[in-house]
Amino acid sequence: MDIDKLREEIKYDEGSVNKIYLDHLGLPTFGIGHLVLESDPEHGWEVGTDVSEDRCIEAFNSDIENVLSDCHRLYPDFDDLPEEVQRIVANMMFNMGRPRLSKFKGMKRGVDAKDWNAAADEMVDSRWYRQVTKRADRLVERMRN
């Protein structure tokens, strides 16, 4: 998979903010959609506090590694999927995390069967789709093609 292309797509969807902000769920976040964890040095920082570009990149790199690891856990044949499907699944994994994406059982059945339309239909039939409609529309369209 072209990791640079994945990184560009996620950066486009997430945006990049070099300070602590609240995401659409009201959770502290910084950089390229990095949810502040208790283990992060930024934990407890006030909204609006600046975060260095280097730290934002470091967090994004770590997040991408975790996303790809989670993709392989959820889809053991992840490397054998078409690259476009790999990037779609990875984008969704970045956005939702493995606990939520693992609940997309119909989508997983579609991907496992290489039935891209069935997988796309299951993507649409979700709360995630209603929450991030523009992003979801792009990913669904790509899955269908």
What role is predicted for each listed range?
Residues F30:
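Conserved functional hotspot residues at active sites or interaction interfaces
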Residues N18-Y21, R73-E84, E122:
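Surface-exposed patches in mature extracellular/periplasmic domains of secreted proteins
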Residues M1-K19, L25-G26, H34-V36, V51, ...:
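Long, amphipathic alpha-helical surface segments
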Residues H43-Y75, E83-A90, F94-L101:
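Alpha-helical segment that forms one wall of the substrate-binding/catalytic cleft
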